[in-house]
Amino acid sequence: MTAHRDTRVNRNHFANIFLLLLCACAAAPGPAVHDKLDSKTGATVSVLPEPVELLTSGYIGVHTGAFAYLGPFELDQMGARTLYLWVLLPHDVSASVAPVIHCDDAPVTLPLQPAGPGNMGLAEPPYAPPDPWGAQWYFALDDPTLTCFARAHRITIDVPNARGELMRFTAESAKDVAGFPVLETFAERRGTKGL
């Protein structure tokens, strides 16, 4: 009788281990999209947990920024939802020439929002700038471009530096992964068509 009970306990133990291993193999959910309330305007802003970081391809000196950042954000003002793209460039690149953004090898044409966050109904930028002296740019973003970014193998930003030399900042998708999961999660959450 004791041997029968030991076998049953062992079976339950093995079943629990099997279920634990099976659950461990399940895919983890993508990074969450954050919603925050602009306290001065009452608008809801949906953003990524962190903006996408782009790295420059060459050495640009110790006193210059080696990173650029971009992040989509959605502004919801009393049910009117508008999609934008926030771009931050290092402080030493030209703040007077709009950057050229590429999805894989194709340049994307996005309307520039020249007045900054105040004209869009925000009291402060959607992302906390990692480089507080960097140049911030805002663009109107559409669903096809967001889909392209989500599925891209490479996103690049070209912009001249203060000396007029072209600087390129690049983000590449992880090896053996098609696209940027964080951007795909953002696009899926807002119901972007074409994914």
Q: Which residue stretches match the model-derived regions?
A:
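Bacterial N-terminal signal peptides that target proteins for export
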Residues: 3-17
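Short, solvent-exposed loop/turn motifs
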Residues: 44, 107-109, 165-166
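C-terminal motif of bacterial Sec signal peptides marking the signal peptidase cleavage site
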Residues: 23-24
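Short acidic, glycine-rich loop/turn motifs
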Residues: 39, 103-105, 159-164
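Extended low-complexity, serine/threonine- and proline-enriched intrinsically disordered segments
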Residues: 95-120
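Mature extracytoplasmic domains of secretory-pathway proteins
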Residues: 91-94, 108-109, 130, 134
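Internal interaction segment
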Residues: 114-195
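An ectodomain-focused feature that recognizes extracytoplasmic/extracellular
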Residues: 28-97
